[in-house]
């Protein structure tokens, strides 16, 4: 694999001058800004760093950044993120909310009828709504804690701006955790002493040098490493290319344990071990049983570095519950034959073994268990802390495993109030409710205010939420069960959303404020989150389209409405803030890394920190566990957690446990009615819902104008479905349309629809207005129309999107127009 291979498919469109459209920047805007159209400017995104050039006043050419040797073809969709019909052009207010305010008919929310207003009007309505909620309900009535992937950039962080500005008005309900790793980041501190999921992992060079076996467990790094939290470097692909060669030469054995054939498995040409969805824990327990019964485990490591093995063994061997977790017990559940399980156990202890866990495996009911059990297996093997051995929970994310430069990164715009600042409504009275709730339980809170739940050893009392604020995140993408969300939104008095595009979250809002894209403002960011290769100047390409504003400008204006503009900005503008953040970073790196003055940096577009040193995760702990203990209560790896055991939870006990799911395919509960497991993993052609709006790029993968649904040949034949057919996928929670792709990569009983597909509900008559109805058909193919909205367990209370069964059929009715991408029905009054 080389750079040329990665550039195929990019070259044909990235270097071609593109024509204009009705949403293009006027020529005089560029002239007024003094922008040189012959100059290549540098910027970055979650999809990587790149350069842009303008022609006739618009973004015309996009090419990869010089240092990105493995750019993703997603940069072909960048221009469509700026120029597309989904852009929020002006401040807009839902029709009935404009007429009646907090007494509006909330059942009309989602009918997509909006009225254009001025910025002054919109921000005044925003403040008035906050005043009303704080006066009537106090801070428990407002939830502004939901966050998402936002856009890259340290200054224009939508989360920071929203929370700082709203915090100047008053307090509000916050969240804990996230949707990506909610179960993992909660359970692993009890087991390994840190969240692990966002921790730097053992360096790829050490893995390639020392590993004999790599187990990719529900992990697809080749797909997921295309994007990153900051501007991605894509250096991991160089290591994947080396790994591919070592697999070919027989020097490293890679086993992909997954219900489907992943892009990584196909790229590496490695072994595939199919496992039935949601049954990984049974396979892991059977491996443990084999290791115990054949004495294959490292007893010395267990005794010296872990706690609780003695409590765990009786469960595995069946002396505790009468069920021995043998390979024969696991085989009919997980679908892996007993002799294969035994061979796998021998392989794992034969040489140096590195587990690489994916995140999707913990986004299911009891999602804490596979992460905990995987850590137990790694402990039994005894190689935690050795180069090329042990366990990782993040080698598919943001260049984890690429040696870090170790340089200080630039700070960000502050999300909290400055010292001695107080909000206008300075109340901390949450009326007996909790001020923080698990991130994935906010719909529960709206529907059941006052209810008490267990969460991570504490009691959480749901607040009575009346108003929501979203900025730079799209919960109508990442939360589960659209129709349940509609029912909850009927109870809200006001919803405010700040976004670039008319996402479904905007559609179900009352006040919508137009933010500009990353490419219409200046910013700075780290180049590579974990590699930390340098600092990138994110230079404005064009002026903001229509009446959109940067996040900084939107909330500066809002702060002015509050009478707190100078407090908010610290009396600095955009470029002053960028220079301040840069200079603070320069001071932190003094004597370690050379950084030019800000003007030179901005002209160059980039500061390079250089390569980093290789590193082994948990090596210090292994070398001396007394001096370098883990962050667990005992300082050791906790196979059995006394703390969790004391919680007394029936769905997360003191050691890893197999528990049946509410619904499970391949003979599990609910499979008689809905026999198909829906896999709604991260997409390969966008970041969550970001870039779905890019029309020309979307058309390169859409099927018959819909999101693809990947189907096994067996299931397709049984239902008379062929490639390109429009398919209705459904269960008792909802229904959607998608375009069929029949593929041998998917075994019987499994379909895949990538999350991030824009929700586009239509009524029974196919109308956009009818999309407000509970039960409406999603016209484009959002899988979270169908997913189950329950917590993983009483411990994490995280999302369980992967616990989802469906059925599907060839769609026979009149095919409705997709309602996801064309924006609202604009009403004049």
UniProtKB/Swiss-Prot annotation:
Enzyme nomenclature, EC number: 1.7.2.3
Co-factor binding details: Binds 1 molybdenum-bis(molybdopterin guanine dinucleotide) (Mo-bis-MGD) cofactor per subunit.
Major subcellular site: periplasm
Induction, per UniProt: By TMAO and DMSO.
Keyword Transcription: no
Extra information: Although torA is induced by both TMAO and DMSO, only TMAO is used as a natural substrate.
Role description: Reduces trimethylamine-N-oxide (TMAO) into trimethylamine; an anaerobic reaction coupled to energy-yielding reactions.
Protein name: Trimethylamine-N-oxide reductase
Species, as recorded: Shewanella massilia
